[in-house]
């Protein structure tokens, strides 16, 4: 019955993706083209992602702040490469209060410019550095081919902005965010194996000197960029006059970074972990880790349901108690399955009579009757096991669908089903341009040992190539 709710992934992966979003009540299209309404189930996922990221960002020393949504157009023009890169995506306000504005205002596509203007006022001496800021906000980038969570005109994100006394300090901090914050959350919370690498000059962020990325493989073999961290050199410092009095008494420009992750991660969770029954949420991320479902009323059923719910919460499990016996049980069970709750506990009169409950694991599909007094231990063990299982499954797919090749032609062929790896020296700028004509990009460059390079000119680099969302 549940399978009929969704288009099978093997039949039409994009349609399956849209079906999951709709049936699991994650989001829907907004009234303006490219806009998105994030429904409570979807927003709960974003809140969990926010919490995991925010804790780590603060542990890295950054403080949250908020900067204006409306940015004077002249700010964007101060950094030539930046405005050139974003110009096709800008939404601009020209009328306010019924009158033509003296200067058009850009609706925030990213905040390097407006943050840079504030940094120039806040930083006076080396004692004010490093300045480490983070913002949770929405941004607008005009999207011609919108797709829920993956590409929408307006989306939610966090964007970090930092200023440092030296290039080395900025480099180290950009890499710290990349690994200690982003990679940690993606791998250990979202159960998402990622390739961490360096973007080519063609693919790097507009105005950056270096862009680092985390790339994940989706269920159809395509790549999804999960997050980026940028070294901005002194480009924005020069454009906005962000300087400081050094310990030696000289005025010097700061070195800046920026980094961000968006609601795109929710799309990644769907496509990396979902199956033909719907969403499968990694237990460490899941807003609801266990759903306690009362099958129907009966002597002792409600009491056991409440007792188990309290015991699970006492063990640190995030629980939802569903006592809506007026709603058909099958519908409620399918709903829990679609939304990817890791564990479902079913309790009915027959179960109480036999001093047991039924435990259903979303990842494995296992359905077993278990003694009531063993539920808490079994649930906590299942959550850890299934977190590992989702990561292992995704990693196996990534390895199976990544081909080592020796030419651009072979990379193009391999990209029809997954990723290709080949020496960067065999690609170069000409090969990258050839790949682009086929809708394929160099996702990132890595060292032969999997490390992240400091320059794309390092010898022996490997290019990861594929189609992407």
What do these predicted regions represent?
Residues 1-469:
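NTP/phosphate- and nucleic-acid-binding module
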């Amino acid at each position: 019955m549940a399978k009929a709710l969704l288009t099978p992934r093997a039949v039409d992966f994009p349609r399956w993706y849209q079906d999951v979003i709709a049936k699991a009540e994650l989001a829907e299209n907004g009234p303006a083209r490219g806009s998105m309404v994030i429904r409570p189930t979807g927003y709960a996922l974003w809140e969990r992602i926010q919490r995991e990221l925010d804790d780590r960002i603060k542990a890295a020393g950054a403080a949250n702040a908020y900067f204006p949504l409306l940015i004077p157009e002249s700010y964007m023009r101060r950094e030539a490469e930046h405005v050139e890169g974003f110009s096709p995506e800008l939404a601009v306000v020209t009328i306010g209060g019924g009158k033509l504005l003296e200067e058009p205002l850009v609706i925030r596509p990213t905040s390097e410019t407006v943050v840079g203007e504030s940094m120039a006022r806040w930083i006076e001496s080396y004692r004010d550095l490093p300045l480490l800021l983070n913002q949770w906000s929405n941004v607008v980038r005009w999207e011609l081919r919108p797709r829920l969570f993956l590409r929408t005109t307006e989306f939610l994100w966090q964007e970090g902005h930092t200023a440092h006394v030296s290039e080395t300090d900025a480099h180290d901090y950009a890499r710290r965010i990349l690994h200690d914050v982003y990679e940690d959350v993606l791998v250990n919370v979202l159960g998402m194996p990622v390739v961490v690498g360096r973007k080519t000059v063609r693919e790097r962020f507009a105005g950056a000197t270096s862009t680092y990325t985390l790339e994940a493989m989706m269920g159809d073999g395509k790549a999804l960029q999960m997050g980026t961290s940028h070294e901005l050199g002194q480009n924005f410092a020069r454009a906005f006059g962000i300087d400081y009095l050094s310990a030696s008494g000289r005025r010097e420009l700061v070195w800046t970074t920026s980094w961000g992750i968006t609601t795109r991660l929710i799309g990644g969770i769907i496509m990396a972990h979902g199956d033909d029954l719907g969403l499968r949420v990694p237990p460490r991320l899941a807003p609801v880790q266990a759903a306690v479902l009362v099958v129907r009323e009966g002597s002792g059923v409600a009491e056991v349901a409440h007792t188990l719910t309290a015991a699970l919460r006492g063990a640190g499990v995030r629980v939802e108690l569903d006592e809506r016996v007026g709603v058909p049980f099958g519908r409620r069970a399918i709903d829990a399955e679609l939304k990817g709750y890791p564990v479902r506990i079913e309790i009915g009169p027959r179960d109480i009579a036999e001093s047991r409950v039924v435990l259903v694991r979303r990842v494995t599909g296992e359905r077993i009757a278990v003694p009531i007094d063993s539920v808490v231990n079994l649930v906590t063990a299942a959550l850890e096991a299934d977190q590992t299982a989702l990561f292992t499954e995704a990693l196996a797919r990534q390895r199976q669908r990544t081909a080592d090749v020796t030419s651009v032609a072979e990379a193009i062929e391999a990209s029809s089903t997954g990723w290709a790896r080949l020496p960067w020296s065999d690609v170069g700028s000409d090969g990258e341009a050839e790949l682009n004509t086929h809708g394929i990009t160099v996702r990132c460059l890595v060292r032969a040992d999997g490390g992240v390079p400091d320059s794309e000119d390092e010898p022996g680099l490997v290019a990861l190539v594929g189609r992407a969302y």
